């Protein structure tokens, strides 16, 4: 019997999951790695530690499932997007730490480019707003701040990659330097209409083309793992950025279907079909996947701090010992007690895009408790997701959401899911398998290798666990949203000089 191995390289941990033909999990392993904060609003990872942790969990997942490497039909890779690595082509050694998607150090560069009117060109070609969230300005920063980097880049001695590319390079032992369209569409460098690296964009960001990876479909054979790693050459047959893999894993394969992933951040995507809609409401248009010689586009809204707000209550304020305790604590309060929490720890994402916003807890009185603050934190995740979907309704012609498919760690929180259904006034549907990110990468790999035969087969494997129906009175919902909007306005533009970023 054969299996699919999914590599799921996330923001805080590296994971590996083994799936069988019915999408059942046969083995799983996970390892957290170091978060590096050199100064406020800077976030880095050690690429060598990422690779080491990923290699370790692959071996562990196979051992846990008692599956031999030669029983793996194919490997799929999914990854934290935008996070940027640059390494030496000859040695494979990174020239700087990976700059993580959450990192805000290049906000000033983005401000300057916006003053020059470059944001409009970038939006039309990439579907992205000009923000430090994306890879482009991170590459520029490394080339300009690491001694000798620019010269080496001009000489073709360096490789750039998002995390998928870095893992692929190491899995094939320097044989393959490539990425897929979904990850490339988050760099600020890919023209999402021509599906090519764009010379004008490279010129704007002063990035040499020589460092860029080859572009490929998301569901295709990239290469094979080097025999020295696992004792077998395993085909690497699928790659997609985490949110796009989750969209595929949720079987949102038809135009108009939507999913929200409640992870470190929240990422709401709507399948918009085969034609890009360039959005002027500050939502993002990206390529979700490429297969069978065409690409599928999504409209996405990104919330920077989703489940991470619960981690902060756990680790920063020590409100509880386990994240799973947040639900029972929040449920001990019948409502938020007038407390609103805007977790703008690293600024605000869609639809506000304010790098200068900061976190705020407002409405506190002597009667406010840990339970009220925890409930407000959970509610903030749903409020931010509501803001995105509300903006999407204005942006997509004739778009009416009937159900929202959900996944990610915080989707297990029933209080949060019910509140989300109440705000959106639509069904929130949680599937039986919530490991949809890893599953999406597995599906893409398995379709390329012939393990699964068709998209229809993928759709048939998707099963419902629980449906949350809206039940909140409309006037109560409207009052909550009114207060949330007041709280959001208080958090905006808090940082008054860019040195504090």
From Swiss-Prot:
GO cellular component terms, semicolon-separated: cytosol
Protein EC: 2.7.1.30
GO process terms (BP): glycerol catabolic process; glycerol metabolic process; glycerol-3-phosphate metabolic process
Keywords tagged on the record: ATP-binding, Glycerol metabolism, Kinase, Nucleotide-binding, Transferase
Binding sites annotated in the UniProt record for ATP: 11-13, 264, 307, 311, 409
Binding site for sn-glycerol 3-phosphate: 11, 81-82, 133, 242
Keyword Kinase: yes
Activity control, per UniProt: Inhibited by fructose 1,6-bisphosphate (FBP).
Residues that bind glycerol: 81-82, 133, 242-243
Gene3D superfamilies: 3.30.420.40
Domain of life of the organism encoding this protein: Bacteria
PROSITE patterns, sorted: FGGY_KINASES_1, FGGY_KINASES_2
Pathways involved: Polyol metabolism; glycerol degradation via glycerol kinase pathway; sn-glycerol 3-phosphate from glycerol: step 1/1
UniProt keyword rRNA processing present: no
Ligand binding (ADP): 11, 15, 264, 307, 409, 413
GO molecular function, one term: glycerol kinase activity
Catalytic reaction equation(s): glycerol + ATP = sn-glycerol 3-phosphate + ADP + H(+)
Residue ranges of the TM segments: none
Family statement drawn from the similarity comment of this UniProt entry: Belongs to the FGGY kinase family.
UniProt-listed NCBIfam families: glycerol_kin (TIGR01311), PRK00047.1 (NF000756)
Protein role: Key enzyme in the regulation of glycerol uptake and metabolism. Catalyzes the phosphorylation of glycerol to yield sn-glycerol 3-phosphate.
Protein name per its UniProtKB record: Glycerol kinase
Gene from which this protein is expressed: glpK
């Amino acid at each position: 019997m054969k299996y699919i191995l999914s590599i799921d390289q996330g923001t805080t941990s590296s994971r590996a999951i083994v799936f069988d033909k019915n999408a059942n999990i046969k083995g799983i392993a996970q390892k957290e790695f170091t978060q590096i904060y050199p100064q406020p609003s800077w976030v880095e990872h050690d690429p060598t530690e990422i690779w080491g942790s990923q290699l370790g969990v692959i071996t562990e997942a196979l051992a846990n499932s008692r599956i031999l490497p030669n029983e793996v039909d194919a490997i799929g890779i999914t990854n934290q997007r935008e996070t940027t690595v640059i390494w030496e082509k000859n040695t494979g050694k990174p020239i700087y730490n990976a700059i993580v998607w959450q990192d805000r150090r290049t906000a000033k560069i983005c401000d300057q480019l916006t003053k020059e009117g470059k944001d409009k060109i970038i939006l039309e070609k990439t579907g992205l707003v000009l923000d430090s969230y994306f890879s482009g300005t991170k590459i520029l920063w490394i080339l300009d701040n690491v001694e000798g980097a620019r010269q080496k880049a001009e000489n073709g001695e360096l490789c750039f990659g998002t995390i998928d590319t870095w893992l692929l390079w190491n899995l094939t032992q320097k044989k393959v330097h490539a990425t897929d369209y979904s990850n490339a569409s988050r760099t600020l460098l890919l023209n999402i209409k021509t599906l090519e690296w764009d010379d004008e964009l490279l010129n704007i960001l002063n990035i040499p083309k020589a460092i860029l990876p080859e572009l490929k479909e998301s569901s295709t054979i990239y290469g094979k793992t080097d025999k020295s790693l696992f004792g077998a050459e395993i085909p690497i047959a699928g790659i997609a950025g985490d949110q796009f893999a989750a969209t595929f894993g949720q079987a949102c394969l038809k135009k108009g279907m939507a999913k929200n992933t409640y992870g470190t951040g929240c990422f709401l995507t709507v399948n918009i079909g085969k034609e890009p809609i360039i959005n002027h409401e500050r939502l993002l248009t990206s390529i979700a996947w490429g297969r069978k010689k065409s690409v599928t586009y999504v409209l996405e809204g990104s919330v920077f701090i989703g489940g991470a707000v619960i981690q902060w209550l756990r680790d920063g304020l020590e409100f509880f010992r386990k994240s799973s305790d947040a639900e029972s604590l929040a449920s001990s309060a019948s409502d938020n007690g007038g407390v609103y929490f805007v977790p703008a720890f690293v600024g605000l994402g869609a639809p506000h895009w304010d790098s200068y916003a900061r976190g705020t807890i407002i409405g506190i009185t002597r009667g406010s408790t840990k339970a009220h603050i925890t409930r407000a934190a959970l509610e903030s995740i749903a409020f931010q997701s509501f803001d995105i979907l509300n903006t999407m309704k204005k942006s997509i012609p004739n778009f009416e959401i009937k159900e929202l498919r959900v996944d990610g760690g915080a989707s297990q929180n029933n209080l949060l899911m019910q509140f989300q259904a109440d705000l959106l006034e639509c069904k929130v549907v949680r599937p039986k398998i919530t490991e949809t990110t890893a599953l999406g990468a597995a599906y893409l790999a398995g379709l390329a290798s012939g393990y699964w035969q068709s998209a229809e087969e993928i759709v048939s494997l998707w099963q419902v666990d629980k449906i949350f129906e809206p039940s909140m009175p409309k006037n109560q919902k409207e009052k909550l949203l009114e207060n949330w909007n007041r709280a959001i306005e208080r958090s905006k533009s808090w940082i008054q000089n860019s040195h504090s970023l």
